[in-house]
């Protein structure tokens, strides 16, 4: 069996799918994308195709090492996202060839169902509460919310009070009938994060995500030492070597690698094992499409320390396509009381509607991150 072609499809809302074809007619799908940098990742995928065409897709480990070590420069979001999507597609092919889901190739199930959570957007508490209630009616009781708007390096007591008041109102609306994490998106400096996290403690959020940027990861241990709230991070770390440093430094209670950014299934399986050795939970980051979610689920179902899985059903920025619009076997990804069952089909278990993918790719949006600015005109963290 040999790889014959790689084809990429940029799609609404802001995703990109990859199809890898073989000379035996078996094809695999992956999802290599950085939202706002899809064209850049697409170029990287096709540049890496030179290492893949003519090779046996079943030699996943060898191909992964070739893509990673075959150049002098390595790592980073662009290259690792390209490798991630390729890796997903290779596992999809191998599972289809052998007639089993990918999790069977990774040792089999450690659980029968996986708890998921929903991301709820909105800045006004009333909007957030309404969104949570709608999802709660559908069986969800775990959520993730924005922790705050962008903050300056040293910001005002008013900004801190506004962020805390918002969380207090949400907690008052639900009591302890729901759990929610707070995502700061690295928009807070370490001095402000210390103040803000301490003020949020009475409202007992499930976790505090990315209180500071991954580039400031040395702050995680210091922040964790000053609070009883679990600190989560990892969506902007791209290899086991980056995760190794934060695990050794301590401070993180939850790792959140992204299966479409951190080298795919091959790399994230290693990251999950490293996290377990440090008694750290796993909650893969996944605001993307169905292939990325399926890849996450295969890691979740073989990793004992996997606790929560993010998914993007109903997320406010899925404009132009919903999570399962490009999937034929939608029932296989049905949620039951906030839980999802293991994929049942061979490979990743996603039956992609290729005709729809081709059609929608003809009008793909060229989405870019908006530039935000502070009141003084300086650029704010996105």
UniProtKB/Swiss-Prot annotation:
Pathway where this protein functions: Carbohydrate acid metabolism; D-galactonate degradation; D-glyceraldehyde 3-phosphate and pyruvate from D-galactonate: step 1/3
Cofactor annotation comment: Binds 1 Mg(2+) ion per subunit.
Gene3D superfamilies, alphabetized: Enolase-like C-terminal domain, Enolase-like, N-terminal domain
Active site: 185, 285
Phylogenetic classification of the source organism: Bacteria, Pseudomonadati, Pseudomonadota, Betaproteobacteria, Burkholderiales
Organism: Ralstonia nicotianae (strain ATCC BAA-1114 / GMI1000)
Protein name: D-galactonate dehydratase
Site location (Transition state stabilizer): 310
Family affiliation: Belongs to the mandelate racemase/muconate lactonizing enzyme family. GalD subfamily.
Enzyme class: lyase
């Amino acid at each position: 069996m040999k790889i014959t072609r790689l084809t990429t499809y940029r799609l609404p809302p802001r995703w990109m799918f990859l199809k890898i074809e073989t000379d035996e007619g078996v094809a695999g799908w992956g999802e290599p994308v950085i939202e706002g940098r899809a064209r850049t990742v697409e170029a990287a995928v096709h540049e890496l195709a030179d290492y893949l065409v003519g090779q046996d897709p079943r030699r996943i480990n060898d191909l992964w090492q070739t893509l990673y070590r075959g150049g002098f420069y390595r790592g980073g979001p662009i290259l690792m996202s390209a490798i991630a999507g390729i890796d997903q597609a290779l596992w999809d092919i191998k599972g289809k060839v052998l007639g089993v889901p990918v999790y069977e190739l990774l040792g089999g199930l450690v659980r029968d169902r996986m708890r998921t959570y929903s991301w709820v957007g909105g800045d006004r508490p009333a909007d957030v509460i309404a969104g949570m209630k709608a999802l709660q009616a559908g069986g969800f009781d775990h959520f993730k919310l924005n922790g705050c708007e962008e903050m300056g390096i040293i910001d005002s007591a008013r900004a801190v009070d506004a962020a805390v008041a918002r969380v207090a109102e949400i907690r008052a609306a639900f009591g302890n009938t729901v759990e929610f994490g707070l995502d700061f998106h690295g928009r807070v400096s370490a001095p402000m994060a210390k103040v803000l996290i301490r003020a949020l403690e009475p409202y007992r959020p499930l976790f505090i995500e990315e209180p500071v940027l991954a580039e400031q990861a040395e702050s995680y241990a210091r922040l964790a030492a000053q609070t009883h709230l679990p600190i989560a991070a990892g969506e902007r770390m791209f290899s086991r070597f980056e995760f190794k440093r934060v695990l050794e430094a301590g401070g993180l209670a939850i790792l959140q690698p992204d299966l479409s950014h951190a080298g795919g299934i091959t790399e994230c399986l290693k990251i999950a094992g490293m996290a377990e050795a440090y008694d750290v939970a796993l909650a893969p980051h996944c605001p993307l499409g169905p292939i990325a979610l399926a890849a996450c689920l295969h890691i979740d179902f073989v990793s004992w320390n996997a606790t929560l899985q993010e998914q993007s059903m109903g997320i406010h920025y899925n404009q132009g396509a919903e999570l399962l619009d490009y999937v034929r076997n939608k029932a296989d990804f049905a949620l039951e009381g906030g839980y999802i069952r293991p994929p049942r089909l061979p490979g990743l278990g996603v039956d992609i509607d290729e005709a729809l993918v081709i059609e929608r790719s003809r009008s793909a949006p060229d989405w870019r991150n908006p530039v935000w600015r502070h009141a003084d005109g300086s650029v704010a963290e996105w």
